[in-house]
């Protein structure tokens, strides 16, 4: 909010539980353009959906995404590309999705499926609360869901932690001290889940949109597989998230998008040239999304 009041344009990738769209009028009053949730997912998934929502009638949208280490070390077979407590929060936050035009809430980690992916092999997908602004900006799309990807077996371990109370927020008394199980668990897992500076890892995402285009039923898919870049010493999560953000920054600097207010990517994507600019910007940095239409 301070940035808006100061009259500064901004592109943001951070998670916060509040609804950024509530600041839309304030941003307009201060002649500010703010693009929010502009990472990989939410972020690129929103760019893709926002663009295709202008050229096809979408009935169904699904995004599956995950960041994983290439080396699978038991028991977790996981490394966190960001703070472990943020990952644990994602594992406990109720997941909202859209079914037949209605917002439905399910427990996080529900609807586990095993899915085969090119390059990554078999991964398990499960519900997480990643649709965010899409729940409210895309009312014409009747079915939408977002799922996170992990190696098979990881979620059973997390579910055991949840059942045992290790991810509870309510402090409990331990030897005269108030201790939050969630904070304690995050501290324990910090070193185990810490991604090494040059550790091989990858980011994978599959976006599926089904609907009508040119009077034909079509399925449009975008597939991302990106690995640690040895030449630049940057992780795939840094690249796929950070370059999406800097692409949007360049949109503002070049005045390709200058509307005032709060805009998640799906509301910027329909502006002529913006989606193409972002895709080209990423491709020039070797972040490639493969499109297929069937």
For each predicted feature, which ranges?
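Short Asp/Glu-rich motifs
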Residues: 22-23, 46, 72
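Short amphipathic alpha-helical segments and helix-helix/interface helices
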Residues: 1, 23-24, 49, 53, ...
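Rossmann-fold NAD(P)-binding glycine/threonine-rich loop
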Residues: 2-5, 13-36
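Conserved donor sugar-nucleotide recognition element shared by glycan-biosynthetic enzymes
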Residues: 19-20, 42-45, 241, 245
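C-terminal catalytic/substrate-binding lobe primarily of soluble NAD(P)-dependent oxidoreductases
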Residues: 54-294
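Adenosine-phosphate binding glycine-rich loop
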Residues: 30-69
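Alpha-helix C-terminal capping segments
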Residues: 2-6, 250-253
């Amino acid at each position: 909010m301070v940035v808006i009041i100061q009259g500064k344009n901004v592109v943001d990738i951070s998670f916060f539980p509040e609804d950024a769209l509530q600041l839309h009028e304030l941003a307009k009053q201060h002649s500010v353009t703010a693009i929010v949730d502009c990472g990989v997912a939410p972020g690129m998934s929103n760019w893709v959906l926002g663009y295709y929502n202008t050229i096809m009638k979408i009935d169904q949208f699904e995004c599956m995404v995950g960041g994983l280490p290439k080396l699978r070390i038991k028991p977790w077979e996981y490394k966190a590309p960001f703070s472990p407590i943020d990952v644990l929060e994602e594992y406990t936050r109720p997941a909202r999705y859209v079914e037949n035009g209605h917002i439905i809430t399910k427990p996080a980690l529900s609807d586990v499926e095993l899915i085969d992916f090119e390059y990554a092999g078999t991964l398990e997908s499960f519900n997480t609360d990643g649709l965010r602004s899409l729940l409210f900006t895309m009312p014409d799309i009747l079915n939408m869901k977002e799922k996170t990807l992990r190696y098979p077996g990881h979620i059973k371990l997390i579910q055991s932690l949840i059942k045992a109370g290790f991810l509870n927020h309510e402090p409990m008394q331990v030897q005269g001290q108030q201790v939050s199980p969630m904070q304690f668990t995050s501290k324990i897992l910090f070193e185990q889940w810490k991604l090494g500076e040059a550790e091989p890892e990858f980011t994978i995402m599959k976006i599926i949109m089904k609907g009508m285009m040119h009077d034909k039923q079509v399925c449009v898919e975008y597939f991302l597989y990106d690995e640690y870049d040895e030449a630049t010493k940057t992780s795939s999560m840094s690249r796929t998230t950070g370059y999406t953000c800097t692409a949007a920054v360049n949109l503002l600097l070049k005045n390709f998008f200058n509307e005032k207010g709060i805009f998640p990517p799906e509301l910027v994507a329909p502006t002529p040239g913006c989606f193409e600019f972002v895709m080209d910007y990423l491709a020039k940095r070797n972040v490639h999304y493969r499109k297929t239409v069937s």
